[in-house]
Amino acid sequence: MANNKKMKKTTRSNLLMFGFVIIFWAVIQLISLTGHMTSKLNGLLIPVCAYIVMAISLNLVVGFLGELSLGHAAFMSAGAFAGIFFYTTAGQMLPKAAAVLIAFLLGGAAAGIFGILVGVPVLRLSGDYLAIVTLASGEILKNVLSALYVGKDSAGIHISLKDQFSLGLAPDGKMLIKGAMGILGIQKFSNFTVGIVLILITLAYVLNLMNSRAGRAITAIRDDEIAARATGLNLTHYKLLAFVSAAVFAGFAGVLYALNYSSLVADKFDYNLSINVLVMVVLGGMGNIFGGMIAAILLTILPEMLRGFSQYRMFIYSIVLIVMMLFNQAPALVAWRQRLVSKVKGEDRNAEKKVETADASYFEEMKNKSSEETGNEESVKEEK
């Protein structure tokens, strides 16, 4: 019965997260329909969705696996460049919906492959060493993409890491990737509903994974790696599963993010982006998916909302970060939050107590009945 109650609590929590995302979508639609949508808010919707997906996916590695990764922006850039490269070339010959869908799939696949290439050697490390290597891999990919020149002419596709003149393009040739300038002339596809659908897919995958046998193995590795190894768990397999899954969804987020702009440059995906996403996860609570989502929304919108307060923007931003950290970590505030949640869920707890009382009464009645039957049997034996 305890397991059933725990399962019901988990299901209720998961449904609340899905409900929050749907309500968020409905509120934005209502704002848009009533004509209160500002250009600033409209421009933030897709980045908010992308960062929510990034925070949820990084939580797999940092929160549930317990490993510090500082290269999450690299997976985002791998997905963005792979997906947008297809979208701006072969995608032009397809219906837009099909081109966007294939761009997402290719972006996720590219990020997953890069995640495997990085994860297989790197996940043998841990702690600071893992953080340093993932950070370095992200910077390496950023520099490679910044030096990448790709062109196309009647002879085919030409690639160079030197400059565009070394491509040897014919007069009818066209530059596809211009080094540090990246990919230009992207036909923007900014669809908030697509972003919400991606969040729901990410949530569904991560929650199902963490409630599965593989998810329990991942958290067991986080809690005690030595004990997990002693039980016969394949640590490399489960670590790689979490790492590559996070990379794939970061790739999806990269495609979503890149489709919101008319150009794509590698410098957007530097180590600062990885740190920002990590801050979202830490402030929301490591292993707390809902908290990470809230932190992603606040930390994406807040800096833009404070641009009018140029002199005090960083001060206010810092205060908000400190308050969020205290709210999540300070023992007194944690206890207050738990009491508040207990009051909100008071009816559910009373119902559970009634069930427990009924169960206890039932078992006590059965126990008394059994004792009476035993006493009667002993009386019969004595008479005989």
Model regions and ranges:
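Transmembrane alpha-helices and adjacent helix-loop boundaries
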Residues: 2-384
